[in-house]
């Protein structure tokens, strides 16, 4: 009581100085700061526990509200000082406070109050206009978001932290969109990025091997949905999100969503079938690019196609060391299924050809990427053809490799005839020429009699069939080729 009365007296004395009297004003400032310091010290003395931080935060809020009416230059600085010591107290003491109050966590209640007050201070505390134009008042909202994120870290179970951060990021993003406040959206992007990083340390390895619906699935799938939802919520032409797009936050969020699913599939499916799941995702991405008219999903689909090729070659085909033997023991059905899925994606890739207007300027790499995106069917075709070609070379017996390549060449040529694509036709012819060259250089001299005759017969039939197609449909072929 005594300290409270002294503080009240000091506040009263500080109000008696005229603003024009410089020395009296300095003394008045001293009185005001002394009063605030006494009350802050009193709170520390009376409540040296988990409730001190919210008391200091509430005191800072009261000073900010009083300053809205009184317009005293010292009150905002006192609020800043109280907020600073509140933040230090919250991070150094309250985060590690484990006691309960009426069955509720003191840490949860106290830090929630501090965070709410900090969000309020970002709006109420008085600052010079030039400071607000620089968004310096959002130091408080950033501090509040950090407190909430740390609170979620300590209060939630390890597997729930990523989901908690993602939901928190979604709330911040929606508020930033609703109120057109960029800083809240930036905080949302940081929270979503942190949630994405978190799954690599806890969620992806959760659950039992082979378990389809388990902790891994139901904690990571919501994150991917939230990331895609945030991407879809970004308006295309509104000025207040122009900077978000200029900084490519929309691209970042969309790529994080796809990367989340890619990582989930890597840990969710048996190691041999990862390549198939990724190929299915390519199909979905190209379909989304066509349905939503978004070149971003086309980029992701083509990038993932390259990942399918790398995974198929490095693990499924040439990953014999994983199985402890020199011969290939991988599942040929997995590579075949992945290749079939990519070939099915041609239905979307052809319709995406030349659909998006891409710049012709830039570096050589940029021009190469844009050229590939203008003709996505080329990459989507050649990747499965190469995978199947290498798979046949590794899987088939020595005497049947050329035979299998000849059959593949005929199928490729028939596909080229069906879709009317020159590069596909040339690929089929190239495979046939490879078969002829292999027969002349290796098979004729090294195969057994039976395998030699089978190879010659099958390749001869393939050449005859292709020649028949050229003769029978020569005019049609010349029209579109």
Predicted regions and their residues:
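Alpha-helical transmembrane segments of multi-pass membrane proteins
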Residues: 1-481
């Amino acid at each position: 009581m005594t300290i409270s009365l002294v503080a009240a007296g000091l506040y009263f004395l500080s109000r008696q100085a005229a603003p024009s009297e410089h020395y009296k004003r300095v003394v008045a400032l001293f009185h005001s700061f002394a009063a605030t310091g006494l009350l802050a010290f009193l709170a520390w003395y009376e409540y040296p526990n988990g409730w001190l931080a919210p008391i200091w935060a509430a005191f800072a809020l009261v000073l900010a509200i009083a300053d809205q009416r009184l317009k005293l230059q010292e009150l905002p600085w006192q609020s800043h000082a109280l907020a600073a010591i509140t933040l230090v107290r919250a991070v150094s003491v309250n985060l590690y406070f484990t006691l309960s109050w009426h069955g509720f966590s003191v840490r949860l209640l106290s830090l929630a109050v501090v965070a709410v007050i900090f969000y309020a201070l970002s709006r109420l505390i008085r600052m010079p206009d030039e400071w607000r134009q620089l968004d310096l008042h959002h130091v408080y909202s950033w501090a509040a978001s950090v407190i909430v994120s740390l609170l979620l870290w300590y209060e939630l179970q390890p597997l729930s932290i990523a989901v908690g951060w993602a939901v928190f990021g979604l709330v911040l993003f929606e508020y930033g969109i609703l109120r057109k406040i960029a800083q809240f959206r930036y905080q949302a992007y940081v929270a979503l990025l942190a949630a994405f990083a978190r799954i690599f340390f806890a969620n992806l390895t959760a659950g039992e091997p082979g378990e389809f619906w388990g902790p891994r699935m139901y904690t990571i799938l919501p994150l991917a949905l939230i990331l895609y939802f945030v991407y879809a919520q970004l308006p295309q032409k509104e000025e207040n999100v122009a900077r978000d797009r200029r900084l490519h936050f929309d691209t970042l969020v969309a790529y994080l969503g796809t990367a989340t699913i890619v990582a989930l599939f890597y840990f969710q499916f048996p190691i041999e079938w990862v390549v198939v799941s990724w190929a299915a995702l390519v199909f979905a991405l190209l379909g989304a690019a066509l349905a939503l008219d978004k070149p971003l999903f086309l980029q992701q689909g083509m990038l993932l196609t390259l990942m399918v090729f790398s995974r198929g070659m490095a693990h499924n085909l040439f990953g014999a060391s994983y199985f402890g033997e020199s011969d290939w023991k991988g599942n040929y059905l997995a590579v075949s299924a992945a290749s079939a899925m990519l070939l099915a994606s041609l239905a979307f890739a052809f319709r995406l050809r030349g659909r998006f207007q891409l710049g012709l300027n830039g570096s050589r790499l940029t021009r190469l990427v844009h050229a590939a995106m203008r003709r996505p069917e080329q990459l989507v075709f050649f990747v499965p053809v190469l995978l199947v070609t290498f798979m046949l070379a590794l899987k088939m017996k020595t005497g049947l490799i050329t035979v299998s390549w000849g059959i593949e060449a005929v199928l490729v040529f028939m596909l080229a005839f069906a879709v009317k694509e020159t590069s596909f036709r040339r690929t089929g012819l190239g495979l046939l020429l490879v078969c002829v060259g292999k027969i002349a250089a290796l098979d004729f001299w090294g195969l057994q009699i039976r395998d030699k005759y089978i190879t010659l017969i099958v390749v001869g039939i393939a050449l005859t069939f292709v020649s028949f197609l050229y003769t029978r449909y020569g005019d049609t072929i010349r029209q579109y080729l």
